[in-house]
A protein has these predicted regions:
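Extracellular beta-strand-rich solenoid/capping regions of secreted or surface-exposed proteins
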Residues: 83-91, 106-172, 181-199, 205, ...
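Acidic Gly/Asp/Thr-rich repetitive segments characteristic of extracellular carbohydrate-active
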Residues: 52-97
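Secretory targeting and sorting signals
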Residues: 1-38
Length: 447
């Protein structure tokens, strides 16, 4: 079996004691923060609440709240989204309202583009690529090079030019309620910018037409794809809230196998890398995905950064990286993890702490099906830490680190060098979280 690859202050919100969904579920104990219009602030001008995770640190996260009418856009096509985003270097505050689902794989006229369209004129063909780099003849000691690899890279670059949307600083991107708002087949790239809000969007089917074969990745090689649904690279003050991330409708079980390895067309769902910092990820729904959230792109990423809060999210049908954390100070609280296999996505682990990551995981709730092993909920390389208490497995308080360490030679440490203080909405008990979060997470909830 191959070894897994590891590459890769206007702030007011109404605090609701119980949402309508929770009341309907008969739950009355939990107090939690949920976005709503407050003091006349509409959905598009809402900003991150004080003390709501790391993104509230310092100047906080306000996105495009100060946008004027000339920089407030409603978009429903790829071309309109590109125009609304403008230049990645333009820091003028802007609000972008996404109405309906935008297909990133379309041209400026709205014509659907296929993988064949991107490959056209590059000289790339999958059959030629497979023949050229077959390990039986090419070997396994070096990366692909030569004409077909250059052609693959050229085709991939054509797709990237079309589906990667570069988000400038001081931007709010929000799905219009009631329109099934989202982006399919595309990637929001938030790179080297500050102060971005992404809310109420469904990100689906982010697919790379041209994965690269790497025979040196792991024991048996791997096919690696290039696009995350949302990618933070050197970004600061980012708030991702009430979004849904899914591979649907193309699940990994439909992927073919070449050279004995899955031809993986999906990469991350929401990756936080290249020294990104001060990020809050809350009330999102992650489902039907393999490598879901990477915090830190390598063991040598920037130290003193990668401070991330992850709370009140639902993770179901997730194989791994929920998240995989390196180096930073990461607070994971009040999340719901369901490790039931869904649509072929069989969980390997939930949280991986490696490269001296300082993780505090507390008051989260895991549902583990019959036969599942608590020892496999965590993972690590022997240098990372996971502190925290109040985590439940099937309703029972469980010491996740003790369970993992008892079964692994690479022990997870239990002490960290920091104490979370930005914890708005924290619930000491995880007991009622599955019922509470069932109807209050993901896209389509905000009004």
């Amino acid at each position: 079996m191959a070894a897994p690859s590891h590459r890769r202050s206007l702030r007011k919100r109404r605090t609701l004691a119980v949402s309508a969904a929770v009341v309907a579920a008969g739950v009355g104990a939990g107090v939690f923060v949920m976005s709503a219009n407050a003091d006349g602030v509409d959905l598009y001008h809402q900003t991150l609440a004080a003390k709501d995770g790391w993104a509230a640190s310092g100047t906080g996260t306000t996105g495009g709240a100060k946008a004027d009418s000339a920089h407030t856009f409603t978009v429903s096509t790829r071309a309109q989204l590109v125009k609304a985003l403008g230049s990645a270097s333009d820091t003028t505050p802007r609000i972008i309202k996404v109405k309906g689902t935008i297909d990133a794989n379309t041209d400026d006229s709205g014509r659907k583009l296929t993988c064949a369209d991107y490959a056209s004129g590059t000289g790339y063909s999958l059959s030629a690529y497979l023949k050229t780099y077959d390990p039986a003849t090419y070997g396994r000691s070096k990366l692909p090079s030569g004409a077909q690899e250059k052609a693959r890279a050229a085709a991939q670059a054509k797709q990237a030019k079309n589906i990667v949307f570069k988000v400038p600083a001081n931007t709010t991107i929000v799905g219009v309620p009631g329109t099934d708002a989202g982006i399919t087949g595309g990637m929001l790239q938030i790179q080297n910018v500050d102060n971005v809000i992404v809310r109420n969007l469904t990100f689906s089917a982010t697919e790379d037409c041209f994965p690269q074969w790497d025979p040196t990745d792991g024991d048996d090689g791997n096919w690696n794809s290039n696009y995350d649904s949302v990618s933070l690279r050197g970004a600061t003050h980012v708030w991702a809230d009430h979004n849904t991330f899914t591979d649907a409708p193309h699940f990994d079980k439909a992927n073919p196998t070449y050279f004995g390895r899955e031809y993986q067309i999906h990469d991350g769902a929401l990756d936080i890398t290249k020294g990104s910092d001060l990020v809050t990820v809350e009330r999102n729904r992650f489902t039907d995905h393999d490598k879901t959230m990477l915090i830190g792109s390598s063991d040598k990423d920037s130290t003193g950064k990668l401070r991330v809060s992850i709370h009140h999210n639902v993770w179901k049908g997730i194989v791994q990286r929920a998240p995989l954390a390196r180096l930073g100070q990461i607070h994971i609280y009040n999340n719901v993890y369901d490790t039931t296999t869904v649509n072929g996505y069989a969980p390997q682990y939930s949280i991986n702490s490696r490269a001296k990551a300082q993780v505090v995981a507390e008051a989260n709730h895991w549902t583990v099906p019959s036969g599942g092993k608590v020892a496999k909920l965590l993972s690590g390389d022997g240098t990372g830490s996971v502190a925290g208490s109040g985590n439940l497995v099937n309703g029972t308080v469980t010491d996740l680190v003790a369970a993992y360490n008892a079964a692994s030679s690479k022990k997870i440490r239990t002490t960290v060098n920091w104490t979370p203080t930005l914890t708005a909405g924290f619930q000491a008990s995880a007991k009622n979280l599955p019922a509470e979060l069932a109807g209050t997470t993901g896209a389509g909830v905000l009004k």
